[in-house]
Each structure stands twice: as C-alpha cells, then as structure tokens.
Amino acid sequence: MHTRVLHVLEFDKVKEQLLEHVSSSLGKEKVEKLFPSSHFAEVTNWQEETDEAVAALRLRGHVPLGGIFDIRASLKRAKIGGTLSPHELLDIASTISASRQLKQFIESLHEEKEEFPHLAGYAEKLAALPEVQQAIERCIDDHGEVMDHASERLRSIRQQLRTTEARVREKLENIIRSQSAQKMLSDAIITIRNDRYVIPVKQEYRGVYGGIVHDQSASGATLFIEPQAVVELNNQLQEARVKEKREIERILTELTSIVAEHAEALLENVDILAQLDFIFAKAKYANKLKATKPVMNDRGYIRLLQARHPLIDQDVVVPNDIELGKDYTTIVITGPNTGGKTVTLKTIGLLTLMAQAGLFIPALDGSELAVFRSVYADIGDEQSIEQSLSTFSSHMVNIVDILRNVDHESLVLFDELGAGTDPQEGAALAIAILDEVHGRGARTVATTHYPELKAYGYNRDGVINASVEFDTETLRPTYKLLIGIPGRSNAFEISKRLGLDERIIERAKSHISAESNKVENMIASLEQSKKRAEEEEKKAKEARMEAEKLRSDWEQKWEELHEKRDEIIEEAKRKAADIVRASQQEAERIIRELRRMQKEKQAEIKEHELIEAKKRLEEAIPTLEKKKKERKKQTQHAFQPGDEVKVTSLNQKGYLVEKVSDDEWQVQLGILKMKINERDLEYIGSAPKTETKPLATVKGKDYHVGLELDLRGERYEDAIVRLEKYIDDALLAGYPRVSIIHGKGTGALRKGVQEFLKKHRSVKNFHFGEANEGGTGVTIVELK
C-alpha cells in the first residue's frame, strides 16, 4: 500500500477525525501510526475489536479512559537508577488507577449477554499493582507535594521548620512594630531574600539592626537586612530545610525503586492502555459517522449499501449502492465533468482503506468489502513541477507505475483516464489500459468523459457502464450513481433551459450523426426506466420490511405466550405435586396411628375414634378436583364493571372499567388502562357499593408521578429524602423503569444516589444512561 495513495484518497483526513476521539497521548500515537493492513486475518481481528468496543459503548454509554499518561520515559529512568520527581510518580499512580478501572469495566461486561473475547484478553493482561499506587499516594498529595506523614523523620523535620519559622517571624514582627521602625524602615513588612527572612531598612539606618545585607532596591535607598537577632534562627531554618530536602530525596528514591521492581509490568500496561484507547476511539468514531461493521472477504468482492463519503457533511452527502467483483470486475463511469464521478471513485477507495485499517464504514449494515493486497489510484491533477511534466504526462507516470505491479489482488481507481491529450488518442489509450488491467483480474473503477468508452462497457465481458444522475430541471447533478447506464452530456438540455435559441440547438443537433443521436435517446430512455424501476423496488422493499417487522412482532408475542403458558403449567404441576405429597404423608401417618392402636391390642377401638380417623383421611385427599371446579366456576363468573380482577398473564391486579366487546374488557392497572381478553381474567371480588371509589383510589396516588426525577442542585440529604419518596411513588404507579438526573459535577451526588439504590430492596438494577439520555449525568433504574 503506497503512502501516496493514502494521501490521494484522503485517509490522513480520516485519521485527523479519529484523533478527536482518543483520550490520551498513547492513543494519539496509535492513530498517527495507523496504516491499512493487506492481511485478511489481521483485518478481521481489527474489525472484531472495533465491534466489541461499539457493543460495550452501546451497553454502558461510556468507558473509563481518564488518567492515562505516557510514563515510558519515567519507567526507563527508574530502571537505570534515576530518581523520579513527585509529578512523575503521580502520573504512574494515575495510570495504574486507570488500568484497574478499565480492567474492572471490561470484566463487568461478562454480565451482559454478548461476548467480548478480544477486550477480555486485553483486560486479563493488565496488571492491577495496587501496592505501587498505594505507596505513591500515601506519600504524595494531588499537587505533587511530599506529605508530612510520608515518614516519621520528615514529620519531625517539618515540625522543627514550622517552630523555628514562627520564632523568626515573631522576632521580626516585634522589630517592625516598634516605634522607631516607622522612620527606619521603608515598609513595615517581612520578606525573603536568598531563602532568609529580612526587613527593608532605609540606607541611612543600615547600622541600627546589625546583621547581614542580602539585597538592595533598584534606587539603592532601601537595604534588605537580616537583623543580627534572627541570624542564628535563620541558620537553624536553613539547616532544617537541607534535612527536609535530603529526606524528600530519600523518600522519592525509595518510591522509585518500588516502581523499578514493576517496570516491565507497567510498560506492558502502557501498551495495552494505548491499544484499548485506540480501539474505543475507533468505536466512538463509528458512532459519530453512524458507521457499521463491513463483512470482509478475500474474493475481491465489493457490495456497498447506501455508502457515504466520510469527509462530506453527512446531512448533504448522497448515499450510493455500489457492487463490484461478482458479475463484473470493471466499472466505467461516463458523463460530464463536475458530475460527482470523482467523489464516487474516492468513496470506494477510502471505504476500502478504512475497512482494512479496522474502522467501521459509513454504509448500511450488510455491506461487504474485500481485503486487497494493494490499492492504486490515479486521481486529480498531480503534475510534477520539478519534472516539468504536463497533466497527461504526470498521469501516465502514475499509470505506468500501476501497470508494473497490478494483479488480481488489486483495486485500481482511474480518474478521467486518458485525459489531457487528443480525444481520439486518449480514448484509445484508455481502452487499451482498461483491457490490460481487466485482463490481469484486478477490480477496477474508471471515470471518463470520452463517449467512445460507453461502447466499451457493452462490448466487454465483466465490464459495466455507470453514470452519475443529472437533474435537467435544476441543472445540477444529483450525485446518485446509476449502474448499467452510461452517462450523457446533457449539453442541449442545459443550453435550452438557460435560454439558447431553439434554432441554434437544432442546428447543433444536425452536426451530430444519427447513430449518436440514437444512442443518446436510448440512454435517456434507460435512465427513465431505471428510475421507475428503482421507485417500484423501493416501495416493494418498504412493504416487505413492514411485513417482516409485523411477522417478527407476532412471532415474539407468540413465543412469549408459549413461555408464559409453560411457566404456568410447570407451576401448577409443582403445586399439585406438593399437595399430593402432603396428602400421602398425612394418609400414611393416619394409617400408622391405626396400626399402632391395633398392635396395642386394645379391647375395642371406640367407634368415635374410627369415625375421626376416617374423617381426617378424607380431608387428606388432594383437593385438585375441588380447585378445578373452583377455577371453572371463576371463569364462568359474570363480570361486572368495578369488579376486582387479576390479569393472569401479567400477574397484576386491577379493576374492570367497561366491556369493549363480547370477550374483551378495559382494565385499570395502576395508571394504565389496557384491553384484556376475558379468558385472561381471574375474578377476585365484586365491585364495592360506592360508585367509582376503587378507581379514584388507584388513580389518586400516582396521578402526578413523572418518569424522571431531577436532583441537580440539591443538597445530598435533601436529595436522598426526595429520591426515597420518588421510588415509593414510582412503585405504586407500577413503573418498571425510571430516570434519576443527578448531573456530572464532582460526582458526589451521583455516588450517593447509586449507594442508596444499591441498598433499596425494590431496585432490580441500575446503570448510567445512553449518550442520548444524558450519559453519566443520569442513572436509569429498573424496579422489581
């Protein structure tokens, strides 16, 4: 794959867009080195990695990629015995923390129904190293300062520093507050020069305080003097600072040695974090482009469905269907310039490069692309000024280079093949070049405005004509690719609409041969027929999709019904078995009691004892028949509006509102009203005497309960009180799922909300919202 081709097809601009989605300098480095692969297995592997990352983002909405630093240089210095600075150590601790969070995030994905083998493989290799992180964070604060409790000696030294410093300031405060200070000092302040405390003394009073002059003002009128009274204390202060510096150096050396012990594991972590950042950047870019995973093949087959050029505004770009490599291996796109032919050419080439780099492509799901050994492109005016070559010559240099290497594993893109020279010779050359490339088995797309190449598409096996549609009403290209129809100039139609005299147009037509006119008319007719066929196909496709959707919905409902039925039958069997088992046990106990009484050889078993035993035996007989009769009796109940019922399929209680048909009732379930078949209803109780009260009672509680609760700006305690009440109200309202808006901010409120939800007995599950629901600023709660 030549770098010149990547530049011509603007792959570098795709990389620039991809860079916007990386989270670290490590990921940026990966993107900058991104290069399409020519190996099928490698491309397939890259695509699967991107697919897993897209699925993870879809399920979780975000991925923890913050706090990753490029610590490779620091690790190398630690390995050779250098001492790391506090900020370098903090970056290492942060990167370890990021590794752990990302590892936990990926491992938690096993809770989902989907598989993530590639991501799980990376996560498994990430070393947690909590002892290294803890050692660093125990000694260094967030600002990169070594803390007092990093060691007992450092604590003691700093205590001495504070005490001595306080004594120095106290002595100097006494000096500057004295009555004589007003005339002797330039200003009543204490300042520092050369790390020693001094006071600003006027030049004429320099001998009053004794001590050492450390500095003077620009004018020389003020001297910064360390009074003799604090010289000794300042000396003690300096000694303490030296001790502090040595102790800090010792602590940093100790921490560096801990890092050095785990340098290899940390370097491997860095490589994995870089790869994961890069993979998730590809996934985020795919989401931005609304791109899909292409099906990759090694047969040279391309099938793009509604493909869009990724660098054109997605609101205005015209999607196209493109197929190559099955019935035909060469497409010749004819028609006038500025008709969108080059955009189509670049779309095919750029999407191929993106797919071979592991990126999703902006096309519909089901699109297919081949892995080519090489992609060649001769596009645009790239004449060499240094070589003083003409446009034709510069193109020919590229074409000669292409012909030197092209084979059946190549994709070749020619823009305006044969242009820049005599039209007749140019067309002949174009045909000969296409024949050569086609004969070698390469997949080829060529654009040209030579009419001679229209016939070429009809006369060669495996070659097809194409054109970009032109709207003669608006005098603009629609940029829609028409496979199977050659292009035409539309010069006469455009001239007529722009006001050129009809006589001139007719005279111009007379200069064109009858054969050419016949071909142009045939092309126009083909365009109209194809347009009508596409419209009919679109309608048929929409109807088929609607039918398939309905079928899918009904199949799902049928499956759910069968699952529910099987569950009910299993539950009934289990209960029946329990009843039979209990009855048998009771019967056996009674029989054992009778036998015991007989064994005791009582003179006579009293009649009332036999009657009592027989009665208990009869009571122990399973009551299934009785239950069946009760069930039958219930189903035969004449339902009335207001009756309390149970909807068996939903396992929910409600009230009958009105009968809507012979076998269907409207049922009030919480705040919902649903139409339920009478067979699905189980009678519980009759309507109360008071009119409509049951409905009012059900409706009253949840009348104003919304599907979301906004806690932004609330104090933590108030927010939790509101949240607890809201969850209770939502449960009474029968909501299966609600949203809690807590915002992003510092994360304190979010953490508090989620801690509360973890402990709530009625919360089934919760997770952050999707990107379009508010992301990490919203928690979605599923209720039991």
Curated annotation (Swiss-Prot):
EC number assigned by the record? 3.1.-.-, 3.6.4.-
GO molecular function (one): ribosomal large subunit binding
PROSITE patterns linked to this entry: DNA_MISMATCH_REPAIR_2, SMR
This protein's UniProt keywords: ATP-binding, DNA-binding, Endonuclease, Hydrolase, Nuclease, Nucleotide-binding, RNA-binding, rRNA-binding
Q: What class of enzyme is it?
A: hydrolase
Q: Where is the Smr domain?
A: 709-784
Pfam families reported for this sequence? MSSS (PF20297), MutS_V (PF00488), Smr (PF01713)
**In its keyword annotation, does this UniProt entry include Hydrolase?**
yes
- Is ATP-binding among this UniProt entry's keywords? yes
Q: Which residues form the signal peptide?
A: none
For this protein, the record's InterPro entries field holds:
DNA_mismatch_repair_MutS_C, DNA_mismatch_repair_MutS_core, DNA_mismatch_repair_MutS_sf, MSSS, MutS, MutS2, P-loop_NTPase, Smr_dom
- Set out the biological process GO terms recorded for this chain's protein: mismatch repair; negative regulation of DNA recombination; rescue of stalled ribosome
For the ligand (ATP), the binding residues are 335-342
Xref: SUPFAM superfamilies: DNA repair protein MutS, domain III (SSF48334), P-loop containing nucleoside triphosphate hydrolases (SSF52540), SMR domain-like (SSF160443)
- Into which family does the record put it? Belongs to the DNA mismatch repair MutS family. MutS2 subfamily.
Described by its record, this protein's role is as follows: Endonuclease that is involved in the suppression of homologous recombination and thus may have a key role in the control of bacterial genetic diversity.
Subunit structure, as described in the record = Homodimer. Binds to stalled ribosomes, contacting rRNA.
Q: Which HAMAP family match?
A: MutS2
- Write down what this protein is called: Endonuclease MutS2
Species in which this protein is naturally found: Geobacillus sp. (strain WCH70)
Q: Which gene encodes it?
A: mutS2
